[in-house]
């Protein structure tokens, strides 16, 4: 089966855009999806967000790419078929799929609704599925997914602006909840104002926190405070501004994926403050231990969220009208979008209009 052409592996014909090599250039690909199983939902993909992880993966920057690679793990659509044992979805329902499509369902993490930390977690693309075949993501016309790994999208949510919540949204929501930074009146710092950072500001404000954005870019102050609603803004390269913010934060969500010093940020925390890393720098960061000891501070990491938590996040976002700030693009613009993403030239997430612009050839 490994030698079969992608379009012949499974019975359902599918079409998407794939990278063939480390250039990361995406182009049309005919492939196939499995038949709808007893516990599967099949859905037509309407929108798919473009995540920075997609860019890393298609260029094999993490060394784990398998080609052809169809990326995309911020996927929303409408159900077209359900298996005979599916209980939670019906044809016509709006659904979303995030970063994973499988897990062992029996380990301690899975039993605690933390499928995202299962050692056998199956990623939405670039992973080996239970049947030994390669998983393909949402830059495609249809998806087939086990119902456990789909979330329901409430009717009042705009599907295009909801897609990025399935990765960026839950990536910041999960640590805010787990580390109890979701309590009204706390003071939260958000490092970096990009796809993840702007979502952290929105969720933080919805939780009732005071939010300070910390950025290297002074020109983002107006955006952070006046448009996104942050309470204050600190330029991390300005020693006086950093000094005035020392010891003021209950928690920090660090969304930056570039190498950067941790020491100045740890200094912003109050005693027993918590700093959670959600960005993925490509080089190791230097960890100064003494500041952790001095204030009994916590430095932790967090990666996406479990399925129960992802549904909770979507429902919370629906209730508080939280959505991603997006630029909708056609499928044939995706390579240009990747180039712009590499330069940080997007506010704040590209979303592909799959349903209206993916043309089978």
Curated annotation (Swiss-Prot):
Binding-site list for Zn(2+) 2: 104, 107, 110, 118
PANTHER family hit by this protein: ALDEHYDE REDUCTASE
Q: What is this protein called?
A: Probable mannitol dehydrogenase
Entry keyword set: Metal-binding, NAD, Oxidoreductase, Zinc
Entry binding sites for Zn(2+) 1: 51, 73, 167
Q: How is the cofactor bound?
A: Binds 2 Zn(2+) ions per subunit.
Essential cofactor(s): Zn(2+)
InterPro entries on file: ADH-like_C (IPR013149), ADH-like_N (IPR013154), ADH_Zn_CS (IPR002328), CAD-like (IPR047109), GroES-like_sf (IPR011032), NAD(P)-bd_dom_sf (IPR036291), PKS_ER (IPR020843)
The entry's family comment says: Belongs to the zinc-containing alcohol dehydrogenase family.
